[in-house]
Amino acid sequence: MERTGPRDPETTADEAAPEPAPGTAPEPAGGDAPTAPEGRDGTRRRPWVRPLRRTALVLALLLLVPLLAAGTALRVNYMGDPADGTYTRDRDAMWLGHAWVDGRKKDADVTALARRLEDTGIRDLYVHSGPLEHDGTLPESAYPRARWLIDAVHRELPGVRVQAFLGDVLATEGPDGMRLTRAATRAAVVRSAKQVLDAGYDGVHLDLEPLHSGDRDYLSLLDDLRSLTRAEDARLSVAAHQIDPLPALHSVAGLFADHPKWWSQEFFGQVARRVDQIALMSYDTAQPLEGTYGGYVAQQTSLALEVTPPTTHLLMGLPFYYESNPSHWGHAETVAAAVRGVRLGLSRTDADRELFGVAPYIDFAATETNWEEYREGWVNP
């Protein structure tokens, strides 16, 4: 699922028939209507049944064959061995929930987090500090304990950056939400970014959804934010939609659904060139099998690497949560499959890419299995 604000149930260390059409001849009365011929068993044959069945079969095959072909291709994409050296570069990141800045977390929780992150490659924390209002503003009351968290992380985890994760729902598929077409709204988002940087954050992590491919207003907003963060010596990072697994698939999907889902590879590259870090949300893929999910992640990794400049830090999202629904099958979207897919994509496209990492989503839903698969597959393969 593409998420603008994490759900955050965290605990702390302390806690009728139609009329005949005009001109239609009525059927003969008195039993003179023709009847269907009888079969050998005495039952009446219906001449329309067999063509209908054939049509249904053809339609089913038209739907099934492409799905089987796509699934097979993804499963093949999951085959092979990752290249040596395709593991953490100590440039990973992690999304954290709102409890870290609203007062629910305490010093003991930071200590526990430090122990958890010890000897991992996680160097950036995207801490949910919003959401933004639809007009682009951000109430300071949304992050009352930000300064405490930033100081505590810098003390317990030297070298780890704390970025303000700011998101909102866009009015791209419904009447409510933020409208980036309004210059005043974009300007307010920039002011909100300045606000959190003044509060001590090391960067701004933007997640606006659903964001359609080719949105020029979004690119304009990123240009303005980049000017700000450069002047403040801070990081600008974004959460990015998945890339078309087939050319122009987002356009085809947009014809049949309100939610096109993917970005074009070209648009992904345009976004990547405007930020310091881009995190592709490579989860909620609707893949039904672990092998097809891993193959999909391998493909997404390659597509992203092809258009992300080497000066931009690319991260691939890992599903540190378990759900079972049509968009995310927990038995298929495992951390192990995601990590192996990332390593395969990296191996095939740019095995020596330095500014590259993975990003677990999200801390409060993570299980021990998630952490083990991350460590075994990526940190210590």
Q: Which ranges hold each PLM region?
A:
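Substrate-binding cleft of secreted/luminal carbohydrate-active enzymes
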Residues: A69-A73, Y283, E306-P381
